[in-house]
């Protein structure tokens, strides 16, 4: 725990053993900016402590509350403590860990595209693909089978081996 906090402090303050780190912005243009893991003042579970408070421009009530904060915390009510917390942080851990309903949108889009694809396939089968060939009808398939049997094709292991030519039926 301590090593993680120390590493976080070193990374935030910019104390590095080398001039540029692996993931640092670099000194190519002479910039001394450092990349903070905390972006846009929104807390993340991996980095919940912001470098700067959530609210930087305070109203008169909030300034008075900040002055009252410098005194004893036993004098503060629960609502004032919550208001001070909200000045510093955007969300609580419970709010950060709360599940979003984004999965509903994703699943809706997935089902929409599956339905659209099914409509395109149906349209292609009806209007684009040619009609069934005549040779695929049941009558033609029966004629082809009879022709193969008449030619006695593959008499050892094929169709002719399972056909009884005397009784004109399949062997049992």
Swiss-Prot record:
Topological domains annotated Mitochondrial matrix: 35-101
Name of the protein: Cytochrome c oxidase subunit 4 isoform 2, mitochondrial
GO cellular component: mitochondrial inner membrane; mitochondrial membrane; mitochondrion; respiratory chain complex IV
Keywords: Membrane, Mitochondrion, Mitochondrion inner membrane, Transit peptide, Transmembrane, Transmembrane helix
A Pfam family annotated for this UniProt entry: COX4
Family from the record: Belongs to the cytochrome c oxidase IV family.
TM segment ranges: 102-127
Organelle targeting peptide span: 1-34
InterPro entries noted in UniProt: Cyt_c_oxidase_su4, Cyt_c_oxidase_su4_fam, Cyt_c_oxidase_su4_sf
Main localisation: mitochondrion
Compositionally biased residues, Low complexity: 13-22
Region feature Disordered, mapped onto this chain: 13-32
Single GO MF annotation: cytochrome-c oxidase activity
A GO biological process held by the record: mitochondrial electron transport, cytochrome c to oxygen
Organism expressing this protein natively: Mus musculus (Mouse)
Superkingdom of source: Eukaryota
Gene3D superfamilies: Cytochrome c oxidase subunit IV
UniProt topology in membrane: Single-pass membrane protein
Membrane-side (Mitochondrial intermembrane) residue stretches: 128-172
Subunit structure comment from the entry: Component of the cytochrome c oxidase (complex IV, CIV), a multisubunit enzyme composed of 14 subunits. The complex is composed of a catalytic core of 3 subunits MT-CO1, MT-CO2 and MT-CO3, encoded in the mitochondrial DNA, and 11 supernumerary subunits COX4I, COX5A, COX5B, COX6A, COX6B, COX6C, COX7A, COX7B, COX7C, COX8 and NDUFA4, which are encoded in the nuclear genome.
Role according to the record: Component of the cytochrome c oxidase, the last enzyme in the mitochondrial electron transport chain which drives oxidative phosphorylation. The respiratory chain contains 3 multisubunit complexes succinate dehydrogenase (complex II, CII), ubiquinol-cytochrome c oxidoreductase (cytochrome b-c1 complex, complex III, CIII) and cytochrome c oxidase (complex IV, CIV), that cooperate to transfer electrons derived from NADH and succinate to molecular oxygen, creating an electrochemical gradient over the inner membrane that drives transmembrane transport and the ATP synthase.
Localisation: Mitochondrion inner membrane
Pathway membership: Energy metabolism; oxidative phosphorylation
């Amino acid at each position: 725990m301590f090593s993680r906090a120390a590493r976080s402090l070193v990374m935030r303050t910019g104390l590095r053993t080398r001039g540029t780190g692996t993931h640092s912005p670099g000194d190519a243009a002479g910039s001394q900016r450092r990349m903070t893991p905390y972006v846009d003042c929104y807390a993340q579970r991996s980095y919940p402590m912001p470098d700067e408070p959530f609210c930087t421009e305070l109203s008169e009530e909030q300034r008075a509350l900040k002055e009252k904060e410098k005194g004893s915390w036993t004098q503060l009510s629960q609502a004032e403590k919550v208001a001070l917390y909200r000045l510093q942080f955007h969300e609580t851990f419970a709010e950060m860990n709360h599940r979003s309903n984004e999965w509903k949108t994703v699943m809706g889009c997935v089902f929409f595209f599956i339905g659209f694809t099914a409509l395109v396939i149906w349209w292609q089968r009806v209007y684009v693909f040619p009609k069934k060939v005549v040779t695929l009808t049941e009558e033609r398939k029966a004629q082809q089978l009879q022709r193969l049997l008449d030619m006695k094709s593959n008499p050892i292991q094929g169709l002719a081996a399972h056909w009884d030519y005397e009784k004109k039926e399949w062997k049992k």
